[in-house]
Amino acid sequence: MIKTYDSNEYDVIVVGAGHAGCEAALASAHMGQKTLLVTIGLDMVAFMPCNPSVGGPAKGTVVREIDALGGQMGKNIDATYIQMRMLNTGKGPAVRALRAQADKWQYHEYMKDTIENTPNLTLRQAIVDELVVEDGVCKGVITNTGAKYHAKSVVLTTGTAARGKIIIGELMYSSGPNNTTPSIKLSENLEKLGFKLRRFKTGTPPRVNGNTIDYSKTEEEPGDKVPRHFSYESKDENYLQNQISCWMTYTNPVTHEVIRDNLDRAPMFTGVIKGVGPRYCPSIEDKVVRFADKDRHQIFLEPEGKTTKEVYVGDFSTSMPEEVQLKMVHSVAGLEHAEMMRPGYAIEYDVVEPWQLKHTLETKNVKHLFTAGQMNGTSGYEEAAGQGLIAGINAALSAQGKSGFTLGRNDAYIGVLIDDLVTKGTNEPYRLLTSRAEYRLILRHDNADLRLTEYGHKLGLISDDRYQAFEEKKQAIKDTQARLHEITVHVTDEVQDFLKSIGQEPMKAGVKADVFLRRPHVTINDIERLTGQKIDGDRYVKEQVEIGIKYAGYIKKEETRIARLKRQEAKKIPADIDYNMIEGLATEARQKFEKIRPETLAQAERISGVNPADLAILSVYIQNGRYSRVNK
C-alpha cells in the first residue's frame, strides 16, 4: 500500500494530455485558473497514435470551431502540417472540409512547448489511480506515487489508456496506445463510484519505410496551392508551398485471399476482441468480409513527418498476426518490397457511458468532475479536442462558482457531438459526420468565427485585439453587401459572353450586382471585372458574402427551423421530476427519461425510442402545473 501525502492545490486538474486534455488544460489556464495537467508520459503530449492528420468532413469544421472559441488545435496544425487540402470543393459549402497531413512529431513538440510556456499551467508526469470524492463532490486526485493533489474541479481525458489492451493476432498484452503504460486503477475507481463503463475497440494500420515504397505504382495526392488555414489568425503569406505529397494505391484479389485464408487467426473473427469497433473506420479484414463483392479497396500512403521515413498505410487498419500483415502489405501495388517498421494492432479500452453526463460534460453523479474525449465514446482527435475545450471551460467556470457554458445543435458541430452523446448515448465509437447536423448549411467550415468568436471573447479565451479584427471583418461583410446593392451590372457584350461561357441564360435588362451574384458560378471577382468597380480585397469577406447571397433561401429555411428548436429548448424540465408520476407515458419513454434526465423538451424529443405522444404527455404534464402540485 503506497502512503499518500498532500501535494499542491489547484483550481483545475486535467488528467491525460492527449488532444482533449491539452485543450481542457489550456482553456482553464487561459481563463485564469491555476491548472495542473497530469499525463502518463510527457513524450505522449498531443501524440497521434493513429492517423497523422487533422480535419476532414465535419472534423475540419470542429477544428475551426475550436479556433473560433480560442482553442489551440488549429494553430498547432497550421504550424506543423506537411500538406493541406480542401476536400469536396465540387460540392456545396455545407460539406466542404479542410484536411491537413501533420508532422506528428512536430505537432507533439509544438503543443508541449505551448503548454510549458502558458501561465497558470503546470505539466507533470504521473499516473492517476484514484479520485478524491467527498459527499458526491470531486476534490482532487491521487497518483500511483501517493501524491494527493487538491482541486475545485477535475477533468478526466484518459483516451484509450483506460485498461487498454493491445491485440496483434494471438498476442495480447496490457498497454496504452503505441505501447505506453495503461491506466488500470482509475477505471476500477470509477466503477466503485457508480459509473457504468463499457469496452470499445479501435485499431491502427502498419507503418512502412518510405524508402522501400515503389511510388511509380501509386497515384500522387498533392496539397493545394491556394492558401488554406485552420486558424483564423494564420496568414496567407505563411502558407507552406513545398508540401509533401500523399500517395494512393489499392488492395487487390491477392490481398483479399491472404486475409480470407487467415480469418481463423483474425482476433476480429475468433472472438478474442470483445470491444465494439468503429463503424466508419473498419479494419481491412472487416471490409474484405463485409464487402465481399469488391475486388479492391483504396489505400492512402501518408508520410508521418519531415524527419522520419515512417509511412502510415491509411485505411489498412488490422490486428492480424504480424507475418500475415507482412503478406498483406507485400500484395499491394507499390508495397511489394516495403519494410514494415511497426505492425498494426487493435486496442480495447474503457469508456464512460455518455448518458451519465450533462451537456457541460460534468458527470451527473459526481459534481465538479468532467470527462472528455475518447473516454466518452468518441473516435478522432478532433472530436476529442472539441470536448476537451468545452470540459476545460466548464471546469474553470465551476471552479469560479459560475454557471456552465454549452453549445446547441444550432451553434456548432461540437454542440451536435455533445448533444448526441448525452441524449442518445452510443453503442460504438462515435464519429462526427455532416449528416448528423440538421443545420449544416449554418454550421459551415467558413463561418465558425462568425458563430463562435463572441462566445470565446466573453469567456476570456479570445484577446481584445483578435476580437477587434473580428468586428472589422463583420463590418466589412456588411459594407460589401451594401456595395453590391449599389452597383448595377448592365447588359453588355462582355457580360453576355461571360454568361454564355458559364452556361447561364443571357440578361434581358440590367440588375443590381447582388441579384446578379445569385446566378451559379458568378463570383464577386467576376462582378469587379465586368463592372470595373472595386468591391473588397479580402477573399474571406467575399466568400461570406457570396455564400450568404447564393444560399439565402436555404439559410432562411434553416433559421426558421432553428427558431422552433430554440422555443423547445426554452421549455425546461424540472430537474427533480418523477417520471413515475406521469400517467400515460410508454414504458420505454419512462425508462429513457429516467436514465438520461433531459433538461428541456427539445432534448427529450431527440432521445431514441421516444414518440410524439410521449412528448405531448410530458409537455402537458409540466404546462398544466401537475408537477408543481405533486411536489408541494
Curated annotation (Swiss-Prot):
GO cellular component terms listed in the entry, alphabetical order: cytosol
Record-level Gene Ontology MF annotations: flavin adenine dinucleotide binding
KW Transmembrane helix (keyword) present: no
Pfam families the record matches: GIDA, GIDA_C_1st, SAM_GIDA_C
Protein residues bound to FAD: G16, A17, G18, H19, A20, G21, V128, S183, Q374
Annotated region (Disordered), positions in chain: 206-225
GO aspect biological process, one term: tRNA methylation
Record key words, sorted: Cytoplasm, FAD, Flavoprotein, NAD, tRNA processing
Gene3D superfamilies in the cross-refs: FAD/NAD(P)-binding domain, GidA associated domain, C-terminal subdomain, tRNA uridine 5-carboxymethylaminomethyl modification enzyme MnmG/GidA
Cofactor dependence: FAD
Residues noted as binding NAD(+) in the record, renumbered to the chain: 277-291
UniProt-annotated location(s): Cytoplasm
Main location group: cytoplasm
Ranges of compositional bias, category Basic and acidic residues: 216-225
NCBIfam families assigned to the protein according to its UniProt record, in alphabetical order: mnmG_gidA (TIGR00136)
Quaternary structure and partners: Homodimer. Heterotetramer of two MnmE and two MnmG subunits.
Family from the record: Belongs to the MnmG family.
Its job: NAD-binding protein involved in the addition of a carboxymethylaminomethyl (cmnm) group at the wobble position (U34) of certain tRNAs, forming tRNA-cmnm(5)s(2)U34.
Protein name: tRNA uridine 5-carboxymethylaminomethyl modification enzyme MnmG
Origin species: Lactobacillus acidophilus (strain ATCC 700396 / NCK56 / N2 / NCFM)
Source organism phylogeny: Bacteria, Bacillati, Bacillota, Bacilli, Lactobacillales
